[in-house]
Amino acid sequence: MGFILFEILSLALLVALFSATGRLVEWAVSRGHSAFQPAFVTRQALGMAVWVAAAFCLAASGLLARWLVFVLAGVMVLAYLVAAVRGRAALEMPSRRDVGLEGLGTAIAASSMGLLLWALFLQTIWPAVGWDANVYHLTVPRLWAEAGGFRPIAFNVYSNWPLNTELLFLVASLLRDYVLAKLIHYWLGVLTLIAVFWIVRRSAGALYGWFAAALVLCNQIVLAEFRVAYVDLAFGFFFFAAFLLLQAALERERRGPRDLIVVGLLSGVMAGI
């Protein structure tokens, strides 16, 4: 039980770190403008993008170390707290309406989805890895961490260039271990479901939003990949997040370069998955 609680806490802290980092980027990009929607999904994506870039810079310069990653995390959190105190980057707490708990039907649908995601969470934290993860998705970041940066890996054709998702796995491995890296891929799947729920709820209602999210999980490939440290759910998440932001930008009567900066950023992250 202690192991499960610790993994929940580890993932929650990592999610909070991504949110704080993403909120800082959002404030810098959209200063004086309304927040990008869906806000939570966008901030998670932006936070991940920043940490992908940070991991790449550290590894490329040979400065990759656990203590330095913790220092950077502390700096990000401190910068966010300063911005929040000044009223520039406060995080809004979701309401019952945001998660679609307005009636009995939606509450039952949300509870069912929660139970399924809980079961997938328990399977994800099981200390076992998939074939591809064992060959390169987790092994390559582990070798980078041991070497303090990028290094040639003989006979491994998948290590010729760092994938963005593997850089996220690298950050998670340095902050905790490979189980947290597996949970990142799980969390990317959850974020995709949140994005699907958000767009459908906005046009058809909360109950249909939960139904749409459930339909995504009916795909056996998606269901299987929740539990392993692969990269496919990351590709789907960043693609869909960029699409939602592009759609929102096109719906505005007045559009400017700021509206497309985040779209381009997330598309770039997706291209490097």
Task: Place the predicted regions along the sequence by residue.
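Membrane-embedded, hydrophobic transmembrane alpha-helices
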Residues: 1-98
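Juxtamembrane segments of multi-pass membrane glycosylation machinery
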Residues: 2-3, 34-35, 61-64, 146-147, ...
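Transmembrane-helix signature of polytopic, membrane-embedded enzymes
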Residues: 34-43, 179-180, 196-218, 237
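Transmembrane-helix motifs of polytopic, lipid-linked glycan transferases
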Residues: 77-85, 180-203, 241
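Transmembrane signal-anchor helices characteristic of membrane glycosylation enzymes that use polyprenol
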Residues: 80-83, 107-131, 218
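Membrane-embedded glycan-lipid processing machinery
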Residues: 153, 157, 161, 168-173, ...
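Membrane-interface transmembrane helices that cradle and orient dolichyl/undecaprenyl
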Residues: 198, 242-260
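Membrane-interface alpha helices of multi-pass inner-membrane proteins
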Residues: 212-213, 259-273
